[in-house]
């Protein structure tokens, strides 16, 4: 469960994202995925313990994650990229990269995709479709990374307490 107190369907959607992004069941996580750093091409899982800022905020090099040399700074339960962190940290007045800040940022990204009302109303398939350009693991994202099936994610969402329309 996310740490933020929010609508049941939104909490379930956040849990679904964590499963989809591979952080909820990450082999090293000590904090429900909030401490996960993207796994690079070397395949070595990694976590962080300092929540004062995004793990890539102070010059840490991005991790190469495929043979094409593409790099990522994805971190935390929702694999949030450092590229967008300074903007949202300021916009949302986030004091740190704590679990609560990560939840608030994820909800803001969902809001910007116009999916919050769909999630609240239980229109999960539509919400997933609206958010697929944010999270590479969602079906139809098209980032060339592993995508989960819509059926699997709907099942995860329902198991996490999501109530369909």
From Swiss-Prot:
Gene3D superfamilies noted in UniProt: 1.10.530.10
Subcellular location: Host cytoplasm
EC assignment: 4.2.2.n2
Stored InterPro entries: Endolysin_lambda_type, Lysozyme-like_dom_sf
SUPFAM superfamilies referenced in this protein's UniProt entry, alphabetically: Lysozyme-like (SSF53955)
Domain of life: Viruses
Active site: 21
Record's keyword terms, sorted: Antimicrobial, Bacteriolytic enzyme, Cytolysis, Host cell lysis by virus, Host cytoplasm, Lyase, Viral release from host cell
This protein's name: Endolysin
Species whose genome carries this gene: Escherichia phage P2 (Bacteriophage P2)
Protein encoded by which gene: K
């Amino acid at each position: 469960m996310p740490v933020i107190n929010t609508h049941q369907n939104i909490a379930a959607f956040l849990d679904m994202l964590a499963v989809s992004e591979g952080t909820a069941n990450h082999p090293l996580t000590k904090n429900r995925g909030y401490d996960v750093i993207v796994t690079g091409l070397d395949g070595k899982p990694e976590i962080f313990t300092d929540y004062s800022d995004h793990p890539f905020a102070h010059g840490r090099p991005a991790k190469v994650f495929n043979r094409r040399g593409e790099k990522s700074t994805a971190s935390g339960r929702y694999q949030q990229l450092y590229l967008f962190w300074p903007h949202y940290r300021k916009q949302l007045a986030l004091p740190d990269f704590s679990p609560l800040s990560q939840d608030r940022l994820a909800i803001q990204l969902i809001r910007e995709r116009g999916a919050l009302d769909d999630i609240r109303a239980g229109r999960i398939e539509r919400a997933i479709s609206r958010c697929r350009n944010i999270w590479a693991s969602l079906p139809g994202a098209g980032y060339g990374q592993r995508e989960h099936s819509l059926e699997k994610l709907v099942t995860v969402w329902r198991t996490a307490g999501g109530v369909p329309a």
